[in-house]
């Protein structure tokens, strides 16, 4: 599958002005993940496309990630799309490690995945290996999705959703050594 990566270099203030808040998306950074379906459950009532063999493909998936933290914060992670139609949760695509302090646009022309026209499309997205210095509750970035189905020229989208830290053990560990260093300097004075 071909994927195009485009890092957009813009000043942070300009990026922040572009952010529009939509429905909230919560992604757990720890042991569990909460995912948002790529397609609405009632998509068959809205989509009219020619289907061969009763299966339909998802194509031209475009994902835009807009940071809600400073570029210097060091937030990074891998974005994945996976099939959640069964327990295996096969990954359809996983990016390289992305710097989530910059605006990122991902384009996936074709997913190696088709689904029965009589069921929901069980494709979900999430983040793994997410690293950030922030504690729970901090919103890190906004994600918006657009996609097309089969041969249809019509484009579908989800409103921008903010991803926030729910659990970040690494961030808490990183804070402890800095407190020790501060206490050492205080005792030496």
From Swiss-Prot:
A Pfam family reported for this protein in Swiss-Prot or TrEMBL: TBSV_P22
GO molecular function: RNA binding
Keywords on record: Host membrane, Membrane, RNA-binding, Transport, Viral movement protein
Cellular component terms (Gene Ontology): host cell membrane; membrane; viral capsid
GO terms for biological process, alphabetical: transport of virus in host, cell to cell
Keyword Membrane set for record: yes
Location of the protein in the cell: Host membrane
Similarity annotation: Belongs to the tombusvirus/aureusvirus movement protein p22 family.
Physiological role: Transports viral genome to neighboring plant cells directly through plasmosdesmata, without any budding. The movement protein allows efficient cell to cell propagation, by bypassing the host cell wall barrier.
Annotated protein name in UniProt: Movement protein
């Amino acid at each position: 599958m071909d994927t195009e990566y485009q890092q957009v270099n813009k000043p942070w203030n300009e990026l922040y002005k572009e952010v529009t808040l939509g429905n909230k998306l919560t992604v757990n950074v720890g042991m569990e993940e909460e995912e948002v379906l790529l397609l609405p459950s009632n998509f068959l009532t809205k989509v009219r496309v020619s289907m061969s063999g009763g299966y339909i493909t998802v194509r031209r998936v475009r994902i835009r990630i807009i940071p809600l933290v400073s570029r210097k914060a060091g937030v990074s992670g891998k974005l994945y799309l996976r099939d959640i139609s069964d327990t295996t949760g096969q990954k359809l695509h996983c990016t390289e490690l992305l710097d989530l302090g910059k605006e990122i646009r991902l384009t996936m022309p074709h997913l190696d995945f088709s689904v029965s026209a009589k069921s929901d499309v069980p494709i979900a997205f999430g983040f793994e290996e997410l690293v950030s210095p922030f504690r729970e509750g901090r919103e890190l970035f906004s994600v918006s999705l657009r996609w097309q189905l089969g041969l249809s020229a019509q484009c579908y989208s989800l409103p921008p959703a903010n991803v926030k830290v729910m659990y970040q053990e690494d961030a808490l560990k990183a804070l402890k050594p800095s407190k020790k260093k501060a206490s050492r300097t205080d005792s030496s004075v």
